[in-house]
């Protein structure tokens, strides 16, 4: 394959029974991701997650840092051998509760993020999520043991 795996941290952020996703666009397609991003060399997973949450949804500062649980899941996204570009992303997923926070101030400093939306769990099957973890999002509850979801790829 040739490409070194990339580590991406993200968080299942729940608010009143719904989950917050970030909308991304590439030419000809739209998809949704859990808020998060890449881990820099020398950065802990939780520090990377807090930095990414600040960039993608505006949660910043020590007093505003979101307490997180986890990791709650791990997923491999490995592109098929026949795909144009070899890609392998290891997703390490944490969780947090947005209850008590105003979501009106959710803003992104990340140009790749085209918007945010809270989804009811039943809506998740009707959208493209990268990686395709809709079933996990519908079933996961705080306190569940960490789970390896396997190799999942969404074209």
Could you say what each language-model-derived stretch is?
Residues 38, 74, 83, 134-135, ...:
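A generic alpha-helix propensity feature with a strong bias for hydrophobic helices
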Residues 29-32, 104-155:
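Nudix hydrolase/Nudix homology domain
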Residues 1-34, 61-65:
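N-terminal strand-loop-strand
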Residues 39-67, 75-129:
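Unchanged
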Residues 11, 18-19, 64, 96, ...:
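Intrinsic-disorder/low-complexity peptide segments enriched for small residues
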Residues 4-6, 16, 21, 85, ...:
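Intrinsically disordered, low-complexity sequence elements enriched in Ser/Thr/Gly/Pro
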């Amino acid at each position: 394959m040739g490409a070194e795996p990339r580590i991406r941290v993200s968080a299942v952020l729940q608010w009143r029974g719904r989950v917050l996703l970030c909308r991304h666009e590439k030419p000809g397609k739209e998809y949704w991701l859990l808020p998060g991003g890449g881990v820099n060399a020398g950065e802990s997973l939780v520090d990377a997650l807090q930095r990414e949450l600040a960039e993608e949804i505006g949660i910043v500062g020590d007093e505003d840092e979101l307490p997180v649980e986890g990791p709650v899941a791990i997923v491999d996204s490995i592109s098929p051998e026949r795909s144009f570009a070899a890609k392998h992303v290891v997703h390490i997923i944490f969780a947090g509760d947005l209850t008590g926070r105003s979501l009106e101030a959710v803003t992104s400093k990340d140009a790749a993020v085209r918007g945010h939306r809270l989804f009811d769990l039943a809506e998740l099957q009707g959208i493209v999520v990268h990686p395709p973890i809709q079933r996990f999002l519908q079933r996961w509850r705080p306190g569940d043991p960490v789970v390896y979801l396997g190799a999942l790829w969404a074209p």
